[in-house]
């Protein structure tokens, strides 16, 4: 080996780590007020009554029985959310029970 090959090579220079998060000044500009976030089509819903909650529980139970799933708290919650989302989306259903939840007892 000749002396030039024996020289120790310098390690490659490391790049400095740059913080990729936006600065707080930019974040303050991005923040919107609550009034700006509200859409004109936002409607307030009436509070849920106990009768509606009981009916929702019955529908969720019936849904789980139809699908032959076990009644766990998690599956009951998912069934109730499915029913609420179906009713709020306005999906037509021939069942009178969903109309009862939609219009109240």
UniProtKB/Swiss-Prot annotation:
A GO CC term attached to the entry: nucleolus
Compositionally biased tracts (Basic residues): 10-20
Location of region: Disordered: 1-41
GO biological process assignments: mRNA transport
UniProt keywords, alphabetically: Cytoplasm, ERV, mRNA transport, Nucleus, RNA-binding, Transport, Transposable element
Name by which UniProt lists this protein: Endogenous retrovirus group K member 16 Rec protein
Subcellular location: Cytoplasm; Nucleus, Nucleolus
Residues spanned by motif Nuclear export signal: 50-59
Function: Retroviral replication requires the nuclear export and translation of unspliced, singly-spliced and multiply-spliced derivatives of the initial genomic transcript. Rec interacts with a highly structured RNA element (RcRE) present in the viral 3'LTR and recruits the cellular nuclear export machinery. This permits export to the cytoplasm of unspliced genomic or incompletely spliced subgenomic viral transcripts.
The keyword Nucleus appears for this protein: yes
GO terms assigned for molecular function: RNA binding
Taxonomic source organism: Homo sapiens
Motif, Nuclear localization signal: chain positions: 13-20
Miscellaneous section: Despite functional similarity, Rec shares almost no sequence homology with HIV-1 Rev and HTLV-1 Rex. Has a type 2 genome. The HERV-K(HML-2) family contains type 1 and type 2 genomes depending on the absence or presence of 292 nucleotides at the 5'-end of the env gene. Rec proteins are translated from a doubly spliced transcript expressed exclusively by HERV-K(HML-2) type 2 proviral genomes. The first exon comprises the 87 N-terminal amino acids of the HERV-K(HMLM-2) type 2 envelope protein. The second exon (18 amino acids) is positioned in the 3' part of the proviral genome.
Keyword set includes Nucleus: yes
């Amino acid at each position: 080996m000749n002396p030039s090959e024996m020289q120790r090579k310098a390690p490659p220079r490391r790049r400095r780590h740059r913080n990729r998060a936006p600065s707080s000044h930019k974040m303050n500009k991005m923040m919107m007020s609550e009034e700006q976030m509200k859409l004109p089509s936002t409607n307030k819903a009436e509070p849920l009554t106990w009768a509606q909650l009981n009916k929702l529980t019955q529908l969720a139970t019936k849904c789980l029985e139809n699908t032959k799933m076990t009644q766990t708290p998690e599956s009951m919650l998912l069934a109730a959310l499915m029913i609420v989302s179906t009713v709020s989306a306005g999906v037509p259903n021939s069942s009178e029970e969903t109309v009862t939840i939609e219009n109240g007892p």
